[in-house]
Amino acid sequence: MTREEKAQVIEALTAQLAENPTIYLADISGLDAGSTSNLRRACFKANVKLAVVKNTLLAKAMEAAEKDFGELPTVLKGNTSIMLSETGNAPAKVIKEFRKKSEKPLLKGAFVEEAIYVGDDYLDTLVNIKSKEEVIGDIVGLLQSPAKNVVSALKSGGGKIAGILKTLSEKEG
């Protein structure tokens, strides 16, 4: 690979790192061609981009990017694949689902919405992270529930009051 080609790859990686709020680093070494193809299909279905990258080029792209990747560059040893997604937990779900059939891919680290996770033990934590849309949905649901409770109380309360008044008027009448 010439210097110009390396510079182009670094530039492309830097742009991808800047565009995506969710970046996972995984080790897919040891997977045969069929398993790798199945992993790529699973990533495509989950709207996750998967690419094998050279550690040195990715490290330089991380340095050039405006984000603070903290300890993440320290995991750039051995085989590294980068998984990019708009959703924070999509790559983790793909990895967890795929590991039901195989020991790989191993999670090396992740950068999710400015938070850094290093190591495979964070996989379950990352699977349970809610996406921005899910959190917004939960907040909207919480905000709507008190209003619904007040409306239902008024509806049921109004019926009770009318029933009591009717009963009292019948007793007097």
Swiss-Prot record:
Cited Pfam families: Ribosomal_L10 (PF00466)
Matches recorded under InterPro entries: Ribosomal_uL10, Ribosomal_uL10-like_sf, Ribosomal_uL10_bac, Ribosomal_uL10_bac_type
Keyword line: Ribonucleoprotein, Ribosomal protein, RNA-binding, rRNA-binding
Gene Ontology biological process terms, A to Z: translation
A cellular-component GO term for this protein: ribonucleoprotein complex
MF terms in GO: large ribosomal subunit rRNA binding
Protein function: Forms part of the ribosomal stalk, playing a central role in the interaction of the ribosome with GTP-bound translation factors.
Stated family: Belongs to the universal ribosomal protein uL10 family.
Subunit description: Part of the ribosomal stalk of the 50S ribosomal subunit. The N-terminus interacts with L11 and the large rRNA to form the base of the stalk. The C-terminus forms an elongated spine to which L12 dimers bind in a sequential fashion forming a multimeric L10(L12)X complex.
PANTHER family, per database record: 39S RIBOSOMAL PROTEIN L10, MITOCHONDRIAL
Protein name: Large ribosomal subunit protein uL10
Lineage: Bacteria, Pseudomonadati, Bacteroidota, Flavobacteriia, Flavobacteriales
